[in-house]
Amino acid sequence: MLSPQQELPLSEYSSLYDIVVPQDNLLRRINDLVDFTFVYQELANKYCKDNGRTAESPIRMFKYLLLKTIYDISDVDVVERSRYDMSFKYFLGMAPEEDVINSSSLCKFRKLRLEDMDLMNLLIQKSVEIAIEKGIIKSRTIIVDATHTEARSNPYSPIEILRLRSKQLRKVLYAMDDNITQTLPSKNKEDDLAHELDYTKDLLKLITSDASLSEVPAVKQRLNMLKETLSDIEDHYTTSKDADARIGHKTEDSSFFGYKTHIAMSDDRIITAATVTSGEKGDGPQLKELVEQSRKNGMEVNTVIGDTAYSGSENLRLAEDEEKGFTLVSKLHPAISHGLRKDEDKFDYNKDAGMFVCPAGHMAIRKARQGKKDGKWNQSMTYFFDIEKCKTCSRREGCYKEGAKSKTYSIPIRNEEQKRQLGFQKSQEFKDIARQRYKIEAKNAELKQVYGYDKALSYGLDGMQMQGAMTIFAANIKRILKLS
């Protein structure tokens, strides 16, 4: 059962907040900036209003998740810190003496209350609305790019991830006491998961039995991470796989297993739209949705800045549309057009590797320019794929001809739209605007380094979208506070 609204706690100790939580405290400023009643309004229909025991306020539960994102800590740690950190209690709307929730409630809140809702667009729209009200968004330019996030199960096998977490814990212990090595259990040197699980349990048992070690904040944080990893490995045992994650390519020689978050950001560094896809998806096809969503969220878009991945023929035509067009500042690449293929047969261009990726996720192994340079017909760029992969591919029907000795994908170099874009690309105006693209690279780095967005916290596309929504909301709110 859900209470009509979150009630302010009455306590004789509430005056403590005026003493220990200063006016310039980050969490106090966020509380003053954001009216969190929108969370209640969005989630009210997820609760029963007249049956069952009274549920924890959805606003408070949402704030727990926001704290977890801002400080990049685990469920256990955010609840534990809320027990003694007065700024956390103030932010959560708790009385100083009030007890905290059980950390497992956060997992239930994510699964039962936040599923089946467009949390990403809801939170971005709210933060953009606040930025517009504060007069922070002044430009009509957005910068687009994609950032990758490693899946939770990648790139390690169960043994490797256990060893990594154990190593991180031991490193903190060694920093406290060099002689502690003698008391720790012997490392497992065999490539056997059962033995590694036994070693991990022995290590956890030893550390948790010594309060002088387990209660040290740095040790406790690593200890909780190892516990979560152990629990996850035991649930999946020999396999820990994310069914929604896919292999994407950062460069021609390096790849990752996970997801991509496609971001549109204003010139003032406020994220105005975002979509999350599996790792193999191309950047260019997301441009239309990013522009539309930015406009829907209240951003006026006249100019779009992006790298070569966004200068495909479809995007060039979109930019020239009379009603919904914009100035596209994106350098041409001779290999960006999909030609005449159907949507389901399109190959995506990976700007980092400089190669095309087929619908099945396989990247070309080499490329060659074909045709006469000064001939009657335009030259084409031909991409060659690994024929052995094509022979066993589940999507080979209609794509690979049985018995063929090669599989290629060719595209014409420079069409009419590209010719016009090339002329604009040579102008000083293009060069001046393009210099602003560095801002989104800095934003991507901030999301990963400050908010831990380099690694997925859960499995599946839904979990990744939820993580992205909370991360972007936190980043936007902190940016608004900085510019206010």
Residue ranges of predicted features:
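A ubiquitous short alpha-helical element
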Residues: 1, 47-51, 428-432
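Charged, often Cys/His-bearing segments associated with DNA-binding zinc-finger transcription factors
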Residues: 1-34, 41, 396-419
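Short secondary-structure transition/capping motifs
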Residues: 19, 32, 53-57, 67, ...
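Basic, short loop/linker segments at the boundary and entry of helix-turn-helix/winged-helix-like folds
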Residues: 26-66, 71
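Contiguous, well-ordered alpha-helical segments that form the cores/surfaces of helical PPI scaffolds
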Residues: 58-69, 84-88, 261-262, 289-292
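Anion-binding and metal-coordination hotspots
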Residues: 74-77, 82, 98-99, 107-484
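Short, positively charged loop/turn segments that connect secondary-structure elements
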Residues: 87-105
